[in-house]
Amino acid sequence: MDSCHKIDYGLYALEILAQYHNVSVNPEEIKHRFDTDGTGLGLTSWLLAAKSLELKVKQVKKTIDRLNFIFLPALVWREDGRHFILTKISKEVNRYLIFDLEQRNPRVLEQSEFEALYQGHIILITSRSSVTGKLAKFDFTWFIPAIIKYRRIFIETLVVSVFLQLFALITPLFFQVVMDKVLVHRGFSTLNVITVALSVVVVFEIILSGLRTYIFAHSTSRIDVELGAKLFRHLLALPISYFESRRVGDTVARVRELDQIRNFLTGQALTSVLDLLFSLIFFAVMWYYSPKLTLVILFSLPCYAAWSVFISPILRRRLDDKFSRNADNQSFLVESVTAINTIKAMAVSPQMTNIWDKQLAGYVAAGFKVTVLATIGQQGIQLIQKTVMIINLWLGAHLVISGDLSIGQLIAFNMLAGQIVAPVIRLAQIWQDFQQVGISVTRLGDVLNSPTESYHGKLTLPEINGDITFRNIRFRYKPDSPVILDNINLSIKQGEVIGIVGRSGSGKSTLTKLIQRFYIPENGQVLIDGHDLALADPNWLRRQVGVVLQDNVLLNRSIIDNISLANPGMSVEKVIYAAKLAGAHDFISELREGYNTIVGEQGAGLSGGQRQRIAIARALVNNPKILIFDEATSALDYESEHVIMRNMHKICKGRTVIIIAHRLSTVKNADRIIVMEKGKIVEQGKHKELLSEPESLYSYLYQLQSD
């Protein structure tokens, strides 16, 4: 209990949960306002503190089996003060992912372990933005607001559908009159009138049908544009962790599922639903003709539905398998094209071809199974339709022979029945497409339902100066992955040039990713000018941080467009100045098109060293206050590197510079050198100071390179 008084886990939990909901919180202010006796936040004071941050909170009692239905993360409250945050429940394996506030680590608990800790009290917490985001979850309900938005167009479609159904109702009556009246009484004048009337009906029916298709296609195209635009914006707003945890081909395959949704929206599915809505009117008229024949049609409808319901789960599983195999093919194809130089150099084309053939065969086999099952489904529908037709023919003929029904009425009845059965059959067949679209929506939902980097509610501060502080940083990429950074404490002053060295995997690059706010540490704070980056607007930060990586990607544009990428309206003079600092101006001037030269896809038209120098110019052109070189000169030839190092004084002037390098000669002139090993800072100092310690890791690495 003493430890609980020393550390207020309730306050720590509130800080974490508020941060999750993009709400800024000052722990000291909360403690001052609500922890009046200094013993920590009790349940009542915790709820009041959360509400003061405009969070929606509710304390409830829930049994463990009811926790599957709550909105996570939530705070599990314990009487002894050792609260913890419940973040995820895996129903399939009965495991619980929690954040242990005492250990400051995520933990995976088995059912028995969780039962031992859980006391039945849990606090649900949301914010207005969280609730809105939840309601905006992408699934089939996403289209409801879109339909409401374009309700006028859909109402027009509905009105046109009403007239089309009225025409469909009138046409059989004309045929009945011709069969029962005109042919029997030889009424040529009546025949002429009916022919003219029927011709008018047909013309209007064709016009209205085309108009309905046009209106509907126009509205669905708008929805398609909105969805496509939303998808791309959302994709670019996703955090870097989303892309690092998924294969490129898998993401591309999910985005391409938009085509399936587009085809479904612009098809006949929804118009068939509208046609089916008018079935009650047709049933009333058909009942007037013959209750017996109507009952046959009526009883056939559940048969169509039952057959579709029977086929659907099997079809969905096979469609899911087909998608997974297609995603594997996409990933392998992207990987092969990207690594084509390696494949050619290693002469492994036959092996890659064999792998592709096997994967392609699996995909084709999965597609064939889908086709076979879809064919069985369609033929089952046809069987029901033909059976109903035979029964109606037999029963209708009996009714005509017995005098209960005229020939004209039988023909009219069959035409009306066709108006009911046709949309049912179309829907039964479209149901298979609906299964495909259901999977497409689910797959696309993986993209659209993934949380983006938060920009709203974040601090947008003035121009940064360049002071950087790492305070008690502990970080890992996944809850179950090894710790990458452990208890990092480091202060970097404005204008200081820092070199970071160490073995591969020691956490050097991860440190710079935290500066760019690609990730939030699981413990501790990254501060710039005293401002916590967890509460800062990522765009505000990244616009003022220049980064050069070992492998930089150039876009398929001109050189000037690549350098001025973040500010297309930048003057040519600034672009040229940055290029000169980066040692790129001379080779650019020698190109036929100069700065207007198109670099090709990913800069394929340039050498590795040329691409790197353009990337350095791109990082410098916005005059960032913080500059990060992550193995930036390792791909340069010695002449290019000499130009960069010669200009390093100008490059570093007025900036905080962090240089990550394996080649220690690159950092020997740095103001301070940080040596990292297994996620920890083990040494720091100037070049000569570190070499003066013969047993130091830096001396060992330097000796290896000297040899």
Swiss-Prot record:
Domain ABC transmembrane type-1: 154-436
InterPro entries on file: AAA+_ATPase, ABC1_TM_dom, ABC1_TM_sf, ABC_transporter-like_ATP-bd, ABC_transporter-like_CS, ATPase_T1SS_HlyB, P-loop_NTPase, Peptidase_C39
Active site: residue positions: H83
Domain Peptidase C39: 3-125
Transmembrane domains' residue ranges: 158-178, 191-211, 269-289, 295-315, 388-408
Subcellular location: Cell inner membrane
Domain notes for this protein: In HlyB the peptidase C39 domain, the ATP-binding domain (NBD) and the transmembrane domain (TMD) are fused.
Protein name: Alpha-hemolysin translocation ATP-binding protein HlyB
Organism, as annotated: Escherichia coli
